[in-house]
A protein has these predicted regions:
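Conserved beta-strand scaffold positions in the cores of enzyme catalytic domains, especially
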Residues: 28, 59, 104-106, 229-232
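C-terminal lobe/tail of nucleotide-utilizing enzymes
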Residues: 1-4, 18-21, 192-346
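Walker A/P-loop phosphate-binding motif and the immediately C-terminal alpha-helix
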Residues: 27-64
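Residue-level signature of catalytic and energy-coupling elements of molecular machines
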Residues: 35, 107, 126, 147, ...
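Nucleotide-state-sensitive switch-loop elements of NTP-binding domains
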Residues: 26-29, 52, 65-148, 152-153
């Protein structure tokens, strides 16, 4: 939960002490992750969970796919900042800010038309427009979540880090190498701009971490890069079901275990004051680290635990069905017939 400095305690006429979360100032949090890793799912559920705590939340999707806030709005897409600007009409605040689940304010930066321009430019333009229109002063959000594509940390995608738009940065990652590779690149960007007012790192959100071996890999990567794990989020069919309905888990399955995972994560983010510079691995170090884990996994590839690991990656909760040894066939014994002896000739 938030520190006591973030709470206000008061006593109304009923004579009982009450407490509510009060943000001293707007919290700006950037959540990065490679495409398809679950950063938008995570961001939207965090936003929904924070809104349950009575906070005013704004989520800004910084991905050309423009689907960051879909599950906060029953699966519906909203006009993006770049689409609104391309229309040629004067852009009003109501054109780019749309209310979602439980009052969460939704914004999508958008991207260029296919084959034209720079995708990162949408983020630059969106943030500039929001500042010009004094959107943050008008709506006074307690928390702003920037959901940012993390495959590359360049140009517009690096703005939340480079210009200190966000005070804290998280990355969503699994134990897959390419997800960790993207996280390592993010760490390089944070380190590069740390001494010039850039955002600092606050933790890895380990997604799809159902098995001990998956956690071990992410934990070892965190130790190798001098970072920390903010929370583990298991893979769950509950997420899939809710997203097919166009909802977050917080809205679609509020009493589920998965919803509680997101609530715990949201509270941890709210109370987390850690801000530090990671120690990214260089190319050779990352290669050596990956090869060491490859050797470990190959050593145990024939074990039942490894088979279960492979199945779990496809079907959470699956159990390996090991082939039973076939019973040995006993060779058939041919019946022997007594030889007839030739009769002696008289």
């Amino acid at each position: 939960m938030p520190n006591i400095a973030d709470c206000r305690v008061y006593m109304p006429l009923d004579g009982r002490l009450h407490a509510e979360i009060v943000m001293a100032k707007q919290r700006n949090i950037a959540i990065y992750g490679k495409g398809g890793i679950g950063k938008s799912t995570t961001s939207s559920n965090i936003s929904a969970a924070l809104s349950e705590l009575g906070l005013k939340v704004m989520q800004i999707g910084c991905d050309p796919k423009s689907d960051s806030t879909n599950t906060l709005r029953k699966g519906r897409f909203i006009p993006t900042v770049l689409d609104s600007l391309r229309s040629g009409k004067r852009v009003e605040t109501k054109d780019i800010i749309h209310e979602g689940f439980n009052g969460v304010l939704c914004v999508e930066a958008g991207g260029p038309e296919p084959g034209v321009g720079c995708a990162g430019r949408g983020i630059i333009t969106a943030i500039e427009l929001l500042r010009q229109r004094k959107v943050f002063e008008e709506f006074k959000p307690d928390v702003v979540i920037y959901d940012v594509l993390g495959d590359v940390v360049c140009g517009g995608f690096g703005i939340p880090i480079r210009e200190g738009v966000a005070e804290q940065v998280y990355t969503v990652s699994s134990s897959d190498f390419m997800a960790l590779y993207a996280a390592n690149n993010l760490f390089k960007g944070i380190k590069k701009y740390a001494n010039s007012g850039g955002a600092l790192f606050s933790g890895i959100i380990a997604n799809s971490s159902n098995l001990p071996i998956q956690r071990e890999i992410v934990e070892d990567f965190a130790a190798s890069t001098k970072t920390t794990i903010a929370e583990y989020v298991p893979r769950s069919l509950t997420v899939t079901k809710c997203e097919l309905q166009g909802k977050t888990v917080i809205e679609g399955a509020p009493d589920s275990e998965q919803a509680d995972v997101y609530r715990i994560l949201a509270k941890k983010i709210l109370s987390n004051k850690d801000r530090y510079v990671p120690a990214p691995l260089d190319t050779d170090q990352l290669k050596d680290w990956a090869e060491s884990w490859s050797d470990k996994l190959l050593e145990g590839r024939d074990s039942p635990a490894h088979v279960k690991c492979e199945l779990e990656c496809i079907i959470p909760g699956a159990e390996p069905i090991l082939a039973k040894p076939r019973p040995q066939k006993t060779p058939a014994v041919k019946a022997t017939t007594p030889r007839r002896t030739a009769k002696a000739k008289g």
